[in-house]
């Protein structure tokens, strides 16, 4: 809100909160809107009186990636936005990613694709962004980085159990299923 003259929001999306999206559209004069949920999209159309520049369903969100956009913030949780994630990277746009699941499940493929398309994936989650910044500014001069976890599939497990955790167990997160 403090930088409306410096930054312009070209497109915005939501799953179901069409009323909040409509308020944001009005405040920031957003031209293109995407709504995943069909019922929410119908309600949005009733509220706004138009379906012009409205894209319905996650499958259509990639149509919002246009030349007039420099950075795309992806903040859809889970694995449902994986195709959108790939489309953003293929477009060469900078991807601000507030989603851990896409990186954890397909990180090497996404990073390789980003290099091929000469773009960046910038993690927005605070811990991941801190690591990203350290790696960017120190030219990968670290031998190892340890990330602590607050729960997931290992919540309430004893330290002795954690010594033998497999990658398969680690991705079996109760929320990511």
Which residues are covered by each model-predicted region?
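Redox-cofactor binding/interface segments in oxidoreductases and associated redox assembly factors
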Residues: 35, 73-75, 147
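Conserved anion/nucleotide-ligand pocket segment
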Residues: 128-177
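Beta-loop-alpha module in the N-terminal Rossmann-like domain of NAD(P)-dependent dehydrogenases
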Residues: 56-88
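A short helix->loop->beta-strand "cap" motif at the edges of active sites that frequently abuts
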Residues: 29-31, 50-53, 91-94, 117-119
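N-terminal Rossmann-like dinucleotide-binding module
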Residues: 1-31
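Short acidic-hydrophobic, aromatic-tinged amphipathic segments that line or gate anion-handling sites
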Residues: 34-36, 53-60
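Rossmann-fold NAD(P)-binding glycine/threonine-rich loop
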Residues: 44-47, 78-91, 100-120
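Active-site-proximal loop->helix
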Residues: 1-4, 23-24, 105-119, 134-137
């Amino acid at each position: 809100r403090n930088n409306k003259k410096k930054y312009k929001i070209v497109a915005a999306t939501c799953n179901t909160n069409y009323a909040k999206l409509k308020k944001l559209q009005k405040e920031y004069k957003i031209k293109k809107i995407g709504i995943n949920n069909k019922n929410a999209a119908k309600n949005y159309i009733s509220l706004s009186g138009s379906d012009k520049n409205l894209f319905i369903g996650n499958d259509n969100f990639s149509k919002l990636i246009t030349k007039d956009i420099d950075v795309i913030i992806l903040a859809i949780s889970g694995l449902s936005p994986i195709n959108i994630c790939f489309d953003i990277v293929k477009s060469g746009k900078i991807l601000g990613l507030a989603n851990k699941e896409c990186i954890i499940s397909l990180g090497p493929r996404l990073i390789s694709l980003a290099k091929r398309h000469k773009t960046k994936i910038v993690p927005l989650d605070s811990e991941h962004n801190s690591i990203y910044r350290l790696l960017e500014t120190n030219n990968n001069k670290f031998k190892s980085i340890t990330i602590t976890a607050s729960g997931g599939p290992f919540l309430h497990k004893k330290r002795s159990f954690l010594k033998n955790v497999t990658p398969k167990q680690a991705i079996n997160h109760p929320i990511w299923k």
